[in-house]
Amino acid sequence: MLILTRRVGETLMIGDSVSVTVLGVKGNQVRIGITAPKDVAVHREEIYQRIQRGDEAGGTGSENSAE
């Protein structure tokens, strides 16, 4: 596992087309923004696990929208 330190407003790149930006830190929560092509699925881990189990009904719809 690669461990990186980033400050609010800083970005890291995954490959040529995915960027992850630290939007804010409040207590023990970190808000991140992810920019990725439409053909790259981006899910929270618990949603991804539901999809893998075939339990998509438990999802909230598009995971690419802000929560």
From Swiss-Prot:
The entry's keywords: Activator, Cytoplasm, Repressor, RNA-binding, Translation regulation
Gene Ontology CC: cytosol
Location of this chain's protein in the cell: Cytoplasm
Gene Ontology biological process terms from the UniProt entry: mRNA catabolic process; negative regulation of translational initiation; positive regulation of translational initiation; regulation of carbohydrate metabolic process
Gene Ontology molecular function, alphabetical: mRNA 5'-UTR binding
Disulfide feature: none
Keyword Cell inner membrane: no
InterPro entries xrefs: CsrA, CsrA_sf
Role according to the record: A key translational regulator that binds mRNA to regulate translation initiation and/or mRNA stability. Mediates global changes in gene expression, shifting from rapid growth to stress survival by linking envelope stress, the stringent response and the catabolite repression systems. Usually binds in the 5'-UTR; binding at or near the Shine-Dalgarno sequence prevents ribosome-binding, repressing translation, binding elsewhere in the 5'-UTR can activate translation and/or stabilize the mRNA. Its function is antagonized by small RNA(s).
Cross-referenced HAMAP family: CsrA
Record-stated family: Belongs to the CsrA/RsmA family.
Known partners and oligomeric status: Homodimer; the beta-strands of each monomer intercalate to form a hydrophobic core, while the alpha-helices form wings that extend away from the core.
PANTHER family reported for this sequence: CARBON STORAGE REGULATOR
UniProt name for this protein: Translational regulator CsrA
Source organism of this protein record: Stenotrophomonas maltophilia (strain K279a)
Phylogenetic lineage: Bacteria, Pseudomonadati, Pseudomonadota, Gammaproteobacteria, Lysobacterales
This protein's encoding gene: csrA
